[in-house]
Amino acid sequence: MSRVGKMPIALPSGAEATITAAQITVKGPLGSLTQSLNGLVNIENDNGTLNFKVANDSREANAMSGTLRALVNNMVNGVTKGFEKKLTLVGVGYRAAAQGDKLNLSLGFSHPVVHQMPQGVKVETPTQTEILIKGIDRQKVGQVAAEVRAYREPEPYKGKGVRYSDEVVVIKETKKK
């Protein structure tokens, strides 16, 4: 079994897991998430602790035990604490404004960019140059943040663009004559 798959997951208070043959559902104070299961990994709920066991000793089952354990751990963290990604706009005239489930971006194009948020993902703009993306599904939050960043990635000469708040953009030196 993989090292990650061997570690049990302790369910915090307020979170509960329902396991069927085809899927696992984790419910918490922020919502509920569902993950489909395959027959290679068995999950046991022992008084608020989730244990992962491989069905056979194949390499695929070992790999899936670690993957599934990581996915379920992200689900538990999501429904109890939630996930957030912070983006920063760097550049003259670059602005962001959240309007309901839409994010309006002015990124130096001839037109404003409007990004529709998927179900379960909320967006806030504390300032005009900061974007805060929140949700319970880690994959969706990261995907939306990557899509917003892709509209104008940080360029290497001035660093202008949309970047993650913890991202370090290495600035290149300009060509000398």
From Swiss-Prot:
Keywords: Ribonucleoprotein, Ribosomal protein, RNA-binding, rRNA-binding. GO terms for cellular component: cytosolic large ribosomal subunit. One of its GO terms (molecular function) is rRNA binding. InterPro entries: Ribosomal_uL6-like (IPR000702), Ribosomal_uL6-like_a/b-dom_sf (IPR036789), Ribosomal_uL6_a/b-dom (IPR020040), Ribosomal_uL6_bac-type (IPR019906), Ribosomal_uL6_CS (IPR002358). Gene3D superfamilies: Ribosomal protein L6, alpha-beta domain (3.90.930.12). GO terms for biological process: cytoplasmic translation. It holds the Pfam family Ribosomal_L6. It comes from the Bacteria. Belongs to the universal ribosomal protein uL6 family. This protein binds to the 23S rRNA, and is important in its secondary structure. It is located near the subunit interface in the base of the L7/L12 stalk, and near the tRNA binding site of the peptidyltransferase center. Part of the 50S ribosomal subunit. This is Large ribosomal subunit protein uL6. It comes from Janthinobacterium sp. (strain Marseille) (Minibacterium massiliensis). The gene is rplF.
